């Protein structure tokens, strides 16, 4: 297949509402192989373009997988994929212009990921604190120091490769903390969560590309309805991310999202 034909086919797939995962698998294999060949030739502009194309393919493919995981009520697996998509988007949007964003609807994926995440009941996360011996540049291998950095900028593309700082030389674990705003959102306590808000939406959507937006409302519930909730449990209001005794414990009525 000629290069132009391959790129046209991938472009058509990206602009379609197809949910056939085998098509995305084949497209990803093709663009990945092509990217490797172009990188070896040293064509930086084309390599960078192919990386962008590959990344938007990954984002779309992962979002389709996420949608059907949600339909199957595999909530945690979907949550993990949502975070991966969020990271992919953060890297991609640093390396594309407005025309690319509009053409491939990057803003749609960014907004829809945030919308799904807002419905999940996870409020507390585990966070690992560690001392990293050193970081190196993924492009040139240079050891990163405050006063001795290489020419490559973190998060930018170089010949179809993303510059990241790689933890090297081992690390020393210091602590595991419970936090409200984690670096890694997949580290959650495995509890019996209420996914009714997530399921309410997923059960009503027909396609991953159906547009929707959450609007949260509240209702007042008598404090007596929560007499069985321990004061050290998370507050039923689910808004403050505080334990019950530090939030709504002494109120006559509690505002409850529904």
Can you name each region flagged by the protein language model?
Residues 41, 140-143, 153, 238-240, ...:
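General secretory precursor processing signal
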Residues 94-208:
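Residue microenvironments linked to proteolytic maturation
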Residues 200-232:
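Short, charged low-complexity linear segments at domain edges
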Residues 226-245, 249, 256:
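Short Cys/His-rich zinc-binding micro-motifs
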């Amino acid at each position: 297949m000629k290069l132009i034909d391959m790129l046209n086919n991938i472009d058509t797939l990206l602009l379609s509402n197809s949910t056939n995962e085998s098509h995305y698998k084949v497209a990803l294999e093709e663009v990945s192989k092509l990217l490797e060949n172009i990188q070896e030739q040293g064509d930086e502009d084309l390599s960078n373009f192919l990386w962008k194309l590959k990344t938007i393919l990954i984002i779309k493919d992962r979002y389709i997988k996420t949608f059907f995981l949600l339909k199957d009520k595999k909530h945690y697996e979907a949550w993990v994929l949502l975070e991966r998509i969020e990271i992919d988007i953060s890297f991609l949007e640093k390396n594309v212009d407005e025309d690319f964003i509009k053409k491939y609807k990057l803003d749609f994926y960014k907004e829809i990921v945030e919308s799904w995440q807002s419905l999940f009941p996870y409020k507390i996360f585990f966070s690992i604190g560690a001392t990293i011996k050193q970081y190196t540049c993924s492009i040139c291998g240079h050891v990163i120091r405050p006063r001795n950095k290489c020419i490559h900028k973190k998060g930018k593309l170089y010949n179809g490769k993303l510059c990241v700082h790689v933890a090297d030389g081992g690390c020393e674990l210091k602590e595991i903390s419970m936090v409200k705003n984690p670096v890694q959102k997949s580290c959650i306590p495995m509890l019996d969560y209420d996914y009714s808000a997530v399921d309410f939406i997923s059960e009503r959507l027909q396609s991953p590309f159906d547009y929707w937006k959450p609007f949260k409302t509240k209702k007042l519930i008598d404090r007596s309805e929560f007499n069985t909730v321990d004061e050290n449990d998370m507050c039923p209001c689910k808004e403050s991310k505080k334990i019950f005794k530090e939030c709504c414990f002494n109120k006559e009525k509690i505002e409850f999202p529904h």
